[in-house]
Amino acid sequence: FGRFFTGQMTAAGKVPPAKVLVIGAGVAGLSAIGAARGLGAVVRAFDTRPAVREQVSSMGAEFLEVKLEEDGSGEGGYAREMSPAFIAAEMALFEAQAREVDIIITTALIPGKPAPLLITEKTVDLMRPGSVIVDLAAEAGGNCALTQPGAVINHKGVTIIGYVDMPSRLAPTASALYGNNLVHLLADMGGAKSWHIDEGDEVVRGALILLNGTLM
């Protein structure tokens, strides 16, 4: 992105802050909101789960909605597939936002399925030259129709980033956070002294694949 994130007032004129749209307000989306806000951007966010509105607002971002009530909350904090009417409404919202924002960051994933298509080629064409799309769902096929997994491309002046190795690009930090999660998981399971598998624990149950030879 070839401009300031934060707005600037200079003797030569005023530079407005960058406008960022984050699609999907899960862990990655909320992190993206925090990073963009920290750099001084104006941030908007969309998620099919109304429950995350408060989290988005608490981080200083505007929570966008469509005029169609439908809850996209799925299991494990992920979103579920939405109805055709809702998808059409959100597509119209993204097209309207594409005309205004400078950066779109997509993070939408559905467990066990390809990433939902949210940004069409038409939507990309509505963005100004110099704009950027960061597709964090590229490894699962991508939320943008033009994403090429593992590559960075330029489409009519719009840069589309489809990296599939984001954790590897920040290996020390990613490893430290992953290790920290494992330590807490094993401690919650009793540690070395009182190790046990509690099938009633939602976190443990979600991590189980086989138990006593039975596929969970």
PLM regions: where:
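Glycine-rich phosphate/diphosphate-binding loop of Rossmann-like nucleotide-binding domains
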Residues: 4-97
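Structural motif
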Residues: 19-21, 41-44, 62, 102-104, ...
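A structured beta-alpha segment of the ubiquitous adenosine-cofactor-binding alpha/beta core
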Residues: 73-122, 163
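Short, solvent-exposed amphipathic alpha-helical segments in soluble enzyme
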Residues: 37-39, 59-61, 120-126, 149-152, ...
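Short gly/pro/ser/thr-enriched loop/turn and capping motifs at secondary-structure boundaries
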Residues: 51-54, 71-72, 139-143, 167-168
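ADP-ribose/adenylate-binding Rossmann-like module
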Residues: 103-163
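Adenosine-phosphate binding glycine-rich loop
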Residues: 1-8, 138, 144-216
